[in-house]
Amino acid sequence: MSALLAKQRLGFRLRAVCARFAGMVRQTVTANPELFLPVFLLFVWQITAVAVKPQALGLAVLLTLLLLVYGYRVLGKTPWLLRLGWVSPRQGFWLYSVLAGLASSAGVWSIARSFHESLGGVPPPHRVLLASASGPMLEEMLFRGLLFWLVFELLSRCRVSKLAAVSATIVVIAVGFAFSHAGRTGLSLYTTILTGIAFGWMRAQSESTAAAALMHAVYNLVLSYIATF
């Protein structure tokens, strides 16, 4: 009898702990998106990067969809996300981001063909998913989000004019973005700098890192499939 009571008490305590933990998670997800979004983004990015098998790829697709929905729902929800530029873009810039991504991929493809450079073959599905969703989100939140804000704030405090500060920030971040891609040299490095400038221009014009991430995602997705043409 005493053993049964002990088991019941243990069960009640476990349920209470689980309920408290679930409440903490719910509170973090809803009230602290500036904490949950980066953690969830890194988690999805890591899962997708190794999702070679079909079952793992299916899980990666599901998590990616959840990430995109959550990322959209928390646009501009907290002051920290506002600093990162994770907000809805100016009117019309969702569409402009897609068009700019298409134009950028076509431009890079044309440059590569002109110089008889290969863009490689079509990557495996998990790499395409990574390059067209969590990858661009992660890179844009870091480069056109956090670093863009830091460099721009530094130049602004040095009393640099807004136009000059924005222009310099775009170029500096683009160069850093290009050199962060290990192994890129020559034409590949220069085109990465150019696309980084294009992503930065979209960030500045739309006033949204999310718009730059969408442009980046479209660029990667299209380039993945036209690389062999």
Model-derived regions: residue spans:
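Alpha-helical transmembrane spans of integral membrane proteins, capturing the lipid-embedded, hydrophobic core
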Residues: 32-35, 39, 43, 61, ...
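Transmembrane helix-loop-helix hairpins at the membrane interface
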Residues: 125-229
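Short secondary-structure boundary micro-motifs
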Residues: 54-57, 66-70, 117-120, 160-161, ...
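Membrane-interface helix caps and helix-loop-helix hairpins in membrane proteins
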Residues: 49-55, 117-118, 179-187
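Juxtamembrane helix-loop-helix connectors linking adjacent transmembrane helices
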Residues: 51-54, 75-142, 149-160
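Phenylalanine-focused residue identity feature
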Residues: 12, 21, 36, 40-43, ...
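Generic signature of intrinsically disordered, low-complexity segments enriched in small/polar residues
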Residues: 15, 24, 39, 43, ...
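N-terminal, membrane-interfacial amphipathic/helix-forming hydrophobic leader that caps
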Residues: 1-92, 103-109, 224-229
